[in-house]
């Protein structure tokens, strides 16, 4: 089936914002005019050379793009199989891939005359990126963050506040990313006149999934020419791998390769404590089924009555009970493969990256790296894997320390996490 559809993989979504049966826009009447206005503005921006010239300038001179494509030589030798490259998006300004998309959305917000920006965040990286760009352009910034995530991502909370953002802890549900997104949507409904909702992932109502994907696709576009420079003209990766919560970093890497049938595409979900009936994971594609959440139809963790389940992951950025609709479509068509990695496996990969390459990864890309360590030894030495190192691990050191048994309670952040 995947071979039959190969010419259409990059054409979505359709005019209704759907990827097959997934996507769409399930929003209130209050929000629909704003959603349609946003779509209209983005369609204009997409063909506006001045918009992309400003984006290119900001990506280069503010973010620091292109991010390096790094051959992980020691890790490759240690694994003893395929060549492993890391796309180093953790070296971006703000420390993750999130800023790629935030810049685009806030440029759109300014074109629409919006003066107040709201965002949701889980790991804090989207919140930091949004606060950063708002500070640059002098815009008011409000970030919704689950109370549980506020505790486990304390360094990023301080960064957001230092940058001038108001951080609102969300206490409903489990206090994680889903709950933060719920409250951000409620805010947007009541403040449509001056407020722009800057969504951090390839989820939400159309046009967000496509718009965020387009801004993040700079990742995969760079990989295409960077790998050709290092491995020879025309050389493509044999496999691309990225971690998936909502799926923006993965979609950014995957999309430019969707029409290259020789490129294997693998998304790595958060397996938490194991993908089983206990639902102590956030592997929506591996352990969920289709439903509607946050304005779009996609795969979700839900019970027999259709109620959304909380899920679980050591990684705040992957702790989301759904997935972007384009990923759901790629899963259904067979163009991409989706697997899960447990917390334990991600922690092992985190430590391996530190020891082998001197790179402290965030817990999110540690999931992708864990799958690399599983498959690379079984692949030939001329097989090239590119994984997206989508964030750095500064924000996760207290979480990792606690799970590895290190006592950091004498630090202020450590005391906060103990409480």
Curated annotation (Swiss-Prot):
Protein name (record): Tryptophan synthase beta chain
Positions bearing N6-(pyridoxal phosphate)lysine: 98
Cofactor: pyridoxal 5'-phosphate
Coiled coil regions in record: none
Protein species of origin: Ruegeria sp. (strain TM1040)
NCBIfam families: trpB
Quaternary assembly: Tetramer of two alpha and two beta chains.
Domain of life: Bacteria
Name of the gene this protein is made from: trpB
Pathway terms, separated by semicolons: Amino-acid biosynthesis; L-tryptophan biosynthesis; L-tryptophan from chorismate: step 5/5
SUPFAM superfamilies: Tryptophan synthase beta subunit-like PLP-dependent enzymes
Catalytic activity: (1S,2R)-1-C-(indol-3-yl)glycerol 3-phosphate + L-serine = D-glyceraldehyde 3-phosphate + L-tryptophan + H2O
């Amino acid at each position: 089936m995947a071979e039959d559809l190969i010419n259409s993989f990059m054409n979505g979504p359709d005019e209704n914002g759907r990827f097959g049966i997934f996507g769409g826009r399930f929003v209130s009447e209050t929000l629909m005019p704003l959603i349609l206005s946003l779509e209209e503005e983005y369609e204009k921006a997409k063909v506006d050379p001045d918009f992309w010239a400003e984006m290119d300038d900001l990506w280069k001179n503010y973010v620091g793009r292109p991010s390096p494509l790094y051959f992980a030589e020691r890790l490759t030798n240690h694994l003893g199989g395929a060549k492993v490259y890391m796309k180093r998006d953790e070296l971006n300004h703000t420390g993750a891939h999130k800023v790629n998309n935030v810049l685009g959305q806030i440029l759109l917000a300014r074109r629409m005359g919006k003066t107040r920006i709201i965002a949701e965040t889980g790991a804090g990286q989207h919140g930091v990126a949004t606060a950063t760009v708002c500070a640059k352009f002098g815009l008011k910034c409000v970030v919704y963050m689950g109370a549980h995530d506020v505790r486990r991502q304390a360094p990023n909370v301080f960064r957001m506040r230092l940058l001038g953002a108001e951080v609102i802890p969300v206490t409903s549900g489990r206090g994680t990313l889903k709950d933060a997104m719920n409250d951000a949507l409620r805010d947007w409904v009541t403040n449509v006149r001056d407020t722009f909702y800057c969504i951090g992932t390839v989820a939400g109502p159309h046009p967000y999934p496509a718009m965020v994907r387009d801004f993040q696709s700079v990742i995969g576009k760079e990989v295409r020419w960077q790998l050709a420079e290092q491995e020879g003209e025309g050389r493509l990766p044999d496999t691309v791998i990225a971690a998936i919560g909502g799926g923006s970093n993965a979609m950014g890497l995957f999309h430019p390769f969707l029409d290259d049938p020789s490129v294997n595409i693998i998304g790595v979900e958060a397996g938490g404590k194991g993908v089983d009936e206990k639902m102590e994971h956030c592997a929506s594609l591996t352990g969920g089924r289709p439903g509607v959440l946050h304005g779009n139809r996609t795969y979700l963790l839900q019970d027999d009555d259709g109620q959304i389940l909380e899920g679980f992951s050591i990684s705040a950025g992957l702790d989301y009970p759904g997935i972007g609709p384009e990923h759901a479509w790629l899963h259904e068509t067979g163009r991409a493969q989706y697997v899960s990695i447990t917390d334990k496996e991600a922690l092992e990969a985190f430590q391996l990256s530190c020891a082998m390459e001197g790179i402290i990864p965030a817990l999110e890309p540690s999931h992708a790296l864990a799958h690399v360590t599983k498959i690379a030894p079984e692949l030939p030495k001329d097989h090239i894997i590119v994984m997206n190192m989508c964030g750095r691990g500064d924000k996760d050191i207290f979480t990792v320390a606690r799970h590895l048994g290190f006592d950091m309670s004498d630090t202020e952040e450590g005391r906060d996490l103990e409480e």
